[in-house]
C-alpha cells in the first residue's frame, strides 16, 4: 500500500509540464504569497495550522492506500476511512484537506504550494474523477491547465496555458474520446496556431490543417472517421502548392501530383481503387521528360527512361513495328523508318 502524499503528487506531476493562445487568462493578484512570505521571515514563531480541526486526521500518518481497489484505509484493521484528512507543508501552512466516504475521495479539494498559493483544485465522486480540475502555476495564480471529467472520463473542454497566459492546446472530449475541434499552437509564439483538427468520438473526421510559424497553411487534409478521404494538399512554406493527392477511405483514388516550386509538374500518377492506372510521368527541373511508365491494373505495361538531354536510356514493353522490330530501337540508333512505295506493274 502507498502513502497518501505520494498518490497526490504523482497525479499532479503528470500534467505539470504540459503547457500557447486562445487568449490569455486573467491572473489573480499575488496576495496568495503573503502568507508564505510571513512564514519564511518568522518561521521560528509560526503557528502550525494542522491538527486544529476536530475529527480531521493527518493523511500521511493515519491513512494508507490500497491501489488494488483505489481505497484509503485507517486504523490497525485497515477499514475504509470516512471523514477528512489534512497535510501541512514544512513551514506549517495547510497543504491540502481531503474528504472521504467509504475510503474514497469525495467532493472538491484544494492543494496549495508552500507559498500559500493554490496549486490544484480537484473534484471526485466516490473516488472517481468528476467535474472540473484546475492546476495553477506557483505564485502567479496563473492557470496552467483545466480539464473536465464525467464519471472518470475526460468530458468537455481541456485547455493548457504557458506561464504568460497564452494557450498551447485546446481540445474537447466526449466520454474519454477526442470530439470536436482541437487547436494546437506554436510554442512561445503568441496567437500563432500550429494545427487545427476535427474529431468525432476519437477519430479524425473532417478538416485537418497545419500552419507554419508565419500562419501560412502547409497542409490542408480531410478525413472521414479516421480515414483519408478527399483531396490532400501540401504547400511550400510560402503557400505555393507542393503536392496534391486524392483518397477514398484510405485508398488512393485519382491523381497524385507533385510540383516544382515554379509551379510546373515534377511527377504525376493516377490510381484506381488503390492501383496505378494509365500514364505516370516524372520531369526534370527544365520540364524535360525523365521517366514515363504506363500501368494497367497496377502492372507495368511500358516503361521509358531519359537522360537530361532527352536521350532514351531504358525501355521496356515498347510497341513493335510491322517488321517485328521495336520502334524505339530505331530511335535509339538515330534512324527513322520510311515506308517504301510499291512499284506499279
Kindly give the residue locations of the regions a language model identified:
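Bacterial Sec-dependent N-terminal signal peptides
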Residues: 1-25
Amino acid at each position: 500500500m502507498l502513502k497518501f502524499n505520494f498518490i497526490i503528487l504523482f497525479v499532479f506531476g503528470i500534467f505539470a509540464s504540459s503547457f500557447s493562445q486562445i487568449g490569455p487568462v486573467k491572473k489573480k493578484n499575488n496576495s496568495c504569497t503573503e502568507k508564505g512570505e510571513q512564514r519564511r521571515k518568522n518561521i521560528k514563531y509560526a503557528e502550525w495550522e494542522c491538527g486544529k480541526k476536530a475529527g480531521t486526521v493527518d493523511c500521511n500518518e493515519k491513512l494508507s492506500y490500497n491501489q488494488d481497489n483505489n481505497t484509503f484505509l485507517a486504523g490497525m484493521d485497515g477499514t475504509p476511512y470516512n471523514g477528512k484528512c489534512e497535510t501541512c507543508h514544512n513551514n506549517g501552512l495547510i497543504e491540502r484537506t481531503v474528504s472521504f466516504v467509504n475510503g474514497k475521495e469525495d467532493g472538491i479539494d484544494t492543494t496549495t504550494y508552500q507559498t500559500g498559493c493554490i496549486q490544484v483544485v480537484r473534484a471526485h465522486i466516490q473516488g472517481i474523477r468528476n467535474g472540473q480540475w484546475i492546476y495553477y502555476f506557483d505564485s502567479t495564480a496563473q492557470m496552467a491547465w483545466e480539464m473536465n471529467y464525467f464519471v472518470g472520463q475526460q468530458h468537455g473542454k481541456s485547455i493548457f496555458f504557458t506561464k504568460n497566459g497564452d494557450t498551447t492546446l485546446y481540445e474537447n472530449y466526449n466520454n474519454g474520446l477526442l470530439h470536436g475541434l482541437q487547436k494546437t499552437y506554436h510554442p512561445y509564439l503568441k496567437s500563432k496556431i500550429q494545427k487545427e483538427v476535427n474529431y468525432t468520438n476519437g477519430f479524425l473526421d473532417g478538416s485537418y490543417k497545419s500552419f507554419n510559424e508565419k500562419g501560412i497553411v502547409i497542409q490542408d487534409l480531410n478525413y472521414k472517421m479516421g480515414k483519408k478521404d478527399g483531396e490532400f494538399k501540401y504547400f511550400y512554406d510560402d503557400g505555393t502548392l507542393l503536392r496534391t493527392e486524392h483518397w477514398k477511405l484510405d485508398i488512393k483514388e485519382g491523381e497524385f501530383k507533385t510540383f516544382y516550386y515554379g509551379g510546373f509538374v515534377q511527377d504525376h500518377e493516377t490510381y484506381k481503387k488503390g492501383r496505378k492506372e494509365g500514364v505516370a510521368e516524372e520531369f526534370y527541373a527544365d520540364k524535360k521528360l525523365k521517366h514515363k511508365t504506363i500501368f494497367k491494373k497496377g502492372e507495368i505495361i511500358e516503361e521509358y527512361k531519359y537522360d537530361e538531354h532527352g536521350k532514351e536510356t531504358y525501355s521496356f514493353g515498347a510497341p513493335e513495328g510491322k517488321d517485328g522490330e521495336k520502334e524505339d530501337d530505331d530511335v535509339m540508333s538515330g534512324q527513322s523508318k520510311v515506308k517504301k512505295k510499291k512499284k506499279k506493274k
